[in-house]
């Protein structure tokens, strides 16, 4: 039998899972009356426990909340001790992958830095930022990553204007790269902590293009970087 921790935020008992209406009513009590609450998806994740995706919408903007239900209980997360995994993290990734897939398949190739092209290897998509320390750590081990996977990088900086400028320069220089090693050198040049951008080297229009690119993926669910997803999960 799996060892599972259920972290409860409300409690009652029932043999059937909480209905969509019960969950929508629960959320409606916690948000402004102008926010539309709708159960967007639900599916079983462990035994009789269901993951429920709740969409909160207002003025054309929306965000997804994830809860778990069994009977009339709902939980913010379910942790499988045997597998050492959080179902919340897993379902979040599924939801984000679904959102990304709708736009990534039509993404301009100029916005994707491709490293590796081995058809026998899986491909990972990495959303990154030249000023993010964890992104720098991923780049530091990129040669090791490429031994097992092809990598497609999209720059979605979460930092200020200098990170947008660096991203623009990376894309500009990457166009002329003749090999993966050239692309990695370009990435490392602009990811270096001591690299300072000359404001005159990047136009406001080019900065705006990167800003629009990142906003598109933020809207799809990318909330932090590095964010890595298997390309095969984009369905």
Where are these regions (language model features)?
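Positively charged n-region of N-terminal signal peptides that target proteins for export
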Residues: 1-4
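Hydrophobic h-region of N-terminal signal peptides that target proteins for export
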Residues: 8-17
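Short, well-ordered coil/turn elements that cap or connect secondary structure elements
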Residues: 12, 32, 146-148
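Non-globular targeting/processing and membrane-anchoring segments
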Residues: 18-123, 186-235
